[in-house]
């Protein structure tokens, strides 16, 4: 899947209701509700690499760590460090996922579990960073997405997720996450993604806003890496 994230900061209750009504008129398949947590961490400036300890009193540069935990990825989180390195972490065990009806796309294989090849974490990765790595990373912001809805259109080739965005309890806009099948775009030309998503925005009456369809590596598209990269661009308050 290829994604784009749109934030409509000037959204009002009226425009949100109108948008949902318009999507409903397209007779989509409703895939339930969702929410997300997006956390932003900054490196501790006094945590200095050993090789610089004798020449520097603070870290020479600021680094940022982002974590995204959408509810549709059960017990999983995506992390991005400094816009370069991405990791996907899950506590979901494959043999248990099937029993509870969860997707096994992001899960710990049974063989890994039996051989001890896991992170051995009981807590979500973002919680682990906040609680166990305080000497390295300091949480700066927690952005929540609540009241989300999932619409599936065009025979499953298009998914539109909407969510109200809150920072410190204050409404900051309507987030629209658009996901399309790769056969609906030219994956060999990432510069064409913007026009593709703009066409979708106009077709389904999605209000205008700040849109990011940037990818982490144009030569190697990655669903989750590109998604959190787009979140880091859009939810940078």
From Swiss-Prot:
Subcellular locations according to the entry: Nucleus
Keyword match Transcription regulation: yes
GO cellular component, one term: mediator complex
GO biological processes: regulation of transcription by RNA polymerase II
Keyword Nucleus assigned: yes
Keyword field: Activator, Nucleus, Transcription, Transcription regulation
Molecular function via GO: transcription coregulator activity
InterPro entries: Mediator_Med20
Gene3D superfamilies for this protein: 3.30.310.180
Superkingdom classification of source: Eukaryota
Family: Belongs to the Mediator complex subunit 20 family.
Assembly notes: Component of the Mediator complex.
Function description: Component of the Mediator complex, a coactivator involved in the regulated transcription of nearly all RNA polymerase II-dependent genes. Mediator functions as a bridge to convey information from gene-specific regulatory proteins to the basal RNA polymerase II transcription machinery. Mediator is recruited to promoters by direct interactions with regulatory proteins and serves as a scaffold for the assembly of a functional preinitiation complex with RNA polymerase II and the general transcription factors.
Protein name: Mediator of RNA polymerase II transcription subunit 20
């Amino acid at each position: 899947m290829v994604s784009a994230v749109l934030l409509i900061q000037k959204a009002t209750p009226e425009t949100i209701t109108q948008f949902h009504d318009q999507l409903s008129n397209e007779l989509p398949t409703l895939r339930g509700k969702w929410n997300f947590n997006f956390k932003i961490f900054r490196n501790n400036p006094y945590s200095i690499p050993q090789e610089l300890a004798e020449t520097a009193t603070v870290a020479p540069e600021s680094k940022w760590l982002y974590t995204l935990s959408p509810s549709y990825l059960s017990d999983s989180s995506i992390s991005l460090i400094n816009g370069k390195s991405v990791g996907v972490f899950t506590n979901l065990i494959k043999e248990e996922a099937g029993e509870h009806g969860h997707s096994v796309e992001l899960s710990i294989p049974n063989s890994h579990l039996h051989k001890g090849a896991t992170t051995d974490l009981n807590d979500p990765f973002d919680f682990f960073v906040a609680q166990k790595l305080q000497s390295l990373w300091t949480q700066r912001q927690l952005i929540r997405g609540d009241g989300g809805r999932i619409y599936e259109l065009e025979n499953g080739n298009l998914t539109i997720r909407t969510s109200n965005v809150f920072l410190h309890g204050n409404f900051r806009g309507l987030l629209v996450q658009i996901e399309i099948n790769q056969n609906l775009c030219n994956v060999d030309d990432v510069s064409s993604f913007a026009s593709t998503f703009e066409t979708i925005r106009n077709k389904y009456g999605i209000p205008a806003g700040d849109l990011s369809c940037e990818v982490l590596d144009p030569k190697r598209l990655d669903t989750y890496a590109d998604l959190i990269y787009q979140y880091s661009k859009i939810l940078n308050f």
